[in-house]
Amino acid sequence: MDVGVTPRRHNPVDSICRKLQTIQRRDQEINSPFQIPKFQTNSYDSPHSGLRFNLEAILKKHTVRPDDSDSASSAGMLTPTASPGPGSSCNTPRAPITPVNATYSITSTLGTLGTIGDRRTSGTYSRPFRRNCSTPSAQTGDNYFNFTPRYSTQSQGPDTDVRTSKIPTPGLFSYNLNFSSDISNMDSELAYPALVVKRLSLGEGSLFTSEPKKESMAEVSLICEEDLLDTIFQACDTQCRGKVYVSHIVDFLRHTTCRSSEDSGLEELCNMLDPERKDISIDLDTYHAIMKEWIEDCRNQGKDLKNDTQQESSKLRDSLSAKRSALLNMTSGSLEAFGGEASRADLETSDLVFCVADLQLNNQKLQEEVRKLKQAVENMEDTNQKLIEENEELKTQAKMGQQLLQKEKMLKEEVEEMKLSLTSSEESRAQAAAQRKQMERENQSLISKIAALQEENMKVTLEAEELQKKMNDLCDLNADLQVQIHSFDAILADKESLIQEKNKQMDELKVAVVEYSSVTELLRADKNKLESQMQMMQPDVTIPGLSLSVAYRLNQTSSGSLQTELALAQNPLEGLEHLSTSVCFASSLDETLDREVLLLLQGPTPEQLSLEFKSLISRLKREFKEDGLTFLTAIRSLTENSETQEANTDLKMQGLEVQLEQRRTDWIRSLEQLDQYRDSLERELLKMASNMRRSRTEILHLSVKVQEQENQKQQLREEVDRLKTPLDNREASSQTPDHLQQVVEELDGPSLEWDEEYVLSESPPLQELGPDQQMLEELCCDEEVLQALKQEEEEPTETVSDKEKITAKSEGEGEATYDSGVENEEPQRDFTLSHMCLPDKKSERESNEAPFVGEGGEQRPCMSLKEEDRLPECTGPEDAHEQAAPLPHTHCECAGDQPLTYDNLEVTSVKDHILSTEPSSLMTCELVSPSTGHPEVGNSITGRTEQLVGTNGEPEEERLTTGADMSDLQRLGEGQLSKVSAKSDKSLLLPVAEEEEAMPEAVEVTSAGVNSPDKHKTGSKKTVVTSDSNSTGSADSLKDPSEKVKDMTFDPAASEDNIPTVPATQSPKKDPLASRNKLKKEMSSMEVIEEQKAQEDGEPTVVTEKEGDTSVSSENASDSTKDDKNSLSPSDKEIEAEFHRLSLGFKCDMFTLEKRLRLEERSRDLAEENVRKEVISCKALLQALIPRCEEDNQSMEIIHRVQKNLEILVQSMTRVSSRSEMLGAIHQETRVGKTVEVMIQHVENLRRMYTKEHAELLELRENLTPNERSFGSHSERDDFRNKKQTTSNIFKTTSRRISIATIPRSIGGQTHFDMPKDMAETEVERLSRRSPWNMAAKRPPLKRFVSSGTWADIDEPTLMNSPTPSPTDNAPPSLMEGRPAVSRGARGIWIWVALFVVLAVLLALLASLMLQPAVDAAPVGTGDSWMTIQQLLWPYTGLRHNGQPPV
């Protein structure tokens, strides 16, 4: 039953329920209460004697009967599906006690005898009345009803034998509580009042007309019609299909009501459900409709039955009224109606009276009890209603509990999911935190990059502005140069006209020579006649005089060998002198004629030689073709006639061999003649080259002398003008020329550097270098002289390095010709043409691609003058130990044979400069002695180039240009060596001796004072000036030009980075000293020129490593002992540049130290192992030779000696290895000692500079103190100035402290910044210095800051930045006036503290450089990364190792 449905009192299905219950009781009751009683009597005649007894017995019997059947019927009434029968409840399972399936039984005790209290204790006259109730109810006070759960067990005892019922289906609650009472039954003592009521309700009989009304008021049915129909349908629908067969429904109703199949009601229902008798299945809606219709039909039949019952009752009353005893008739009629037999005995009247009296009394009692029961029933109905409501509430709570349980399960699942999601969220949070940290780091790095980019952007903007200015300057300069070019073109036109005139004169002279030769022939014929006459006259005396004429005749009758003629022509004077001394009576006419003849015998003209050469080659080709044809015809004839003429074959073969041998001898003779032609031509060319070199040297000497004189005059005039001009004008004018020079250098450098690298990559292998190139270059020397003079006039600021390069190159070329092979004439002419056709600005690639024919006839590219630059003796990288090694054969021979020609260093051109930028071309200059005073030549040439500018009325610019050139002169050599190192590693790996030789030669080169404006190309590092005999003079010659321009020193690193620099300010009292230094320098340069001319013919010497080291130490000593009047003198700058170079060099050394150590150890071990294996193999071979030479004692002795020699060789090898390692360690120790010396000197220089600047600061502060006190009272003005102080400080520090990169473009250059003492800045500092709170973070201004790549960003109070401000800066004005002595004492303390800090920092740096742990180099699996390291780092450090280490 659904919880929400409320019971109705008048339910149309009540009749069906009552019928079903009555039928169940009728079947279950064994002793039916409706059995007809059998009255027993003592005799048949007197039936009234036992009536009382029989009635009492019957009442007792029906009262004391146990209620088993009632329990069974109660069990059967629980659900319609329960099977009827007394045993249906015995085997049912027991269910747990739950509020859902709990069923309560309401027990009512009805007693006939005694009071209510007696009935409670007496079981004889009372019988329990039980009905099922599934709703608990509170017990009333009269204790008429007991509520006993249906789930009580069997152990309750025999008196209350209540058995467990069948558990109802969950969700189906049957409320079977039916309260029934019989208030109209006269037999009140019967124990089944409800059964009587139900039978009457079925229409089986009623005694009174008031029964239906009372019955409808008393009975309450709680079963709903629809719920009952649903229950029946669900019971029949066992498979839960939603449809039930009609036969199942009819069988269920038949079985439940125990009716037969012929019952009219079931038959009618079957017809209604299945009219066609096909046993169809119907759904729930159809079932409901038909069943409701059938129930209505049954109700209508029930009304008819009630009417029939009333009619029968009236008839019965009539019959009873006719008889005497209504009771008897009533009893009889009742018994007959139930099918019993009427008693035949005649009862006595007295007994009947007694019975009637008892019955009336009992009836009254029962009526009272019925009234009480009605009241109890009403109370129970109210209670039942309350219980129903409470039950509904409990069911709603149960449903809510179930929902809560489901919700709890869902919540648990959600909690598990939340835990999983929480763990995942924790992981994601950890990942997000890691990502956030990573993003923060990246953000910081990006911020730093953005800041760096902003700084770079500012620098680029500044550079762009500067470049714009430089472009404007260059435009002006270009205009001037164009004017000069036009003037030079006019000069060239004049010179070409002169050359043409000279050519005409030469032609005339040739014609005259021809005429003279004809005259000489005539004279020789006369001479022959005279000789013949003399022989006839004096035959004995004329024999000695015949030698010359005989030689002449032999020369005439010879095979025309040019070599023999040239050999005789080279020593004509000696022969003539010998003849003149030995044959004193020879005539002067003979001597003159013989001299002319010998001169004419020097050979035919080049045109004749070329014609003979061509004719000889054509003849050889023709003979070759003829020989080939004859050979082929002979072979063909032999093959054709081999079958027929076998006998003549041998003869023909011999004849052919003879012919071929003759032809071969002819060819050999012709080839020998060609060799003679070539040799004679080579000698002639060599002679011409030597003559031309001599003439060029004389021209250069004269030009140098003239230029030096003009330069000296111009410098003297400049000195006088400079002394007359005031100081401020000099400062203003000293800013521009350096700037202009810097523009020229920066714009010229990269293009030349590119040309240099391109030439290196395009150069052919070393084996293709031919000796003919040097000879032909000597032929081109006159053309080079003209081009060099022209270029000098165009570019007056060109310095010594270009001239020195081309001269050293040409000299090395001339030297190399003495031990080289010979070449033909045609390739020489082609090479000459390829050089002379090149214009001044011709690119390097064009000159490289000019073809010429080589020795073997193949065509190969005509290389420029740089071919000699690739010689291994000059380009080998520096060995790790810098050992001294002797020069190879080429160097020694060239050095011994060739005279000194350093005066040739002047001339060059742009083309030659581009072609000779390889640094090894400079190394050729090492072949000559450094004692020739070459640095002075460089100074004089620089002065001569200054003179050209001075003539245009620009003395100030010329002076500054000279200073820039001299300062660049000091930093050139190391950069060139770096270029050699970085590029030679790419091309070739050289033997150890050549590598060891490279460094001392390079050190000697730097003594030549090489300088070039192309600082990008050649590097901006200081060179270590070395010398053999006069190293001190060389150092002085380098110092003096730099002292001349020390006021205008600028930072090469700053110029590299396009940072504008301003010359430092010098006091006026030092100007006379500078002028005297300049004058002294000019005088020394003139002396050096004369000394160079005197030493021109001296023999060159090769300086070894020890000499180079000695010169380095002597130079350092001279620098350290130099006068300290200027703290930034050239020696200090050199030391500082050397310090930076060494520091970076040590860093790079440590970068590859461990890798190189392992490689060297591995190579050493491999070499020793190889030597050991060779010795072992030699011993094995000797052991194999011993059995074969046992008989020969001399051989055995030799073998034993060889074995002893092998043992000695092994020992010597071990000794050599150990000694070489010791020597390398000593070399390294020497290098470290020099480095420490340089660093100590650098520290001393820094200390002196700091002391000097600190003294200047103290002096400036004392001068500014009175002015500061005058402003002490204006506090508001101080506040205003202090607000502006930060921006001014930022601007000033930005303008001063310019930090260069860690590896700038010119490492090792000067890192001093010379700042001007601007009056506006000084005034701002003086006015804003009084802030007491802001002074702690402010530095006193310095005129110079020393910042390197390592220390640029350190903001410590060391000497690399500015000294710490004194305590007086922080004191208020009132205290400053009162304690000057105390502040000075504290100042001294601070000075010493700063000095100690600087020394500690430098010592720590030195220790880190010396003891730094080794770091592996870049991966060397492929060559790219190693080459990248070399290209980036080593060109700036001067390091030269053995190239890329082997894998």
UniProtKB/Swiss-Prot annotation:
Give the main localization category: endoplasmic reticulum
Compositional bias, Basic and acidic residues, is annotated for: 800-812, 1037-1049, 1080-1096, 1120-1132
Please note every region of biased composition (Low complexity): 420-436
Q: Which region ranges are annotated with the description Necessary for spindle and spindle pole localization?
A: 1076-1265
Lumenal topological domain: 1410-1447
**Cellular component terms per the entry's GO annotation:** centrosome; chromatin; endoplasmic reticulum membrane; mitotic spindle; mitotic spindle pole; nuclear membrane
Task performed by this protein: A maternally expressed membrane and cytoskeletal linker protein, which is essential for attachment of the centrosome to the male pronucleus. Promotes male and female pronucleus congression and subsequent fusion after fertilization. Congression is mediated by the sperm aster microtubules.
Spell out the protein name for this chain.
Inositol 1,4,5-triphosphate receptor associated 2
| Gene source species | Danio rerio
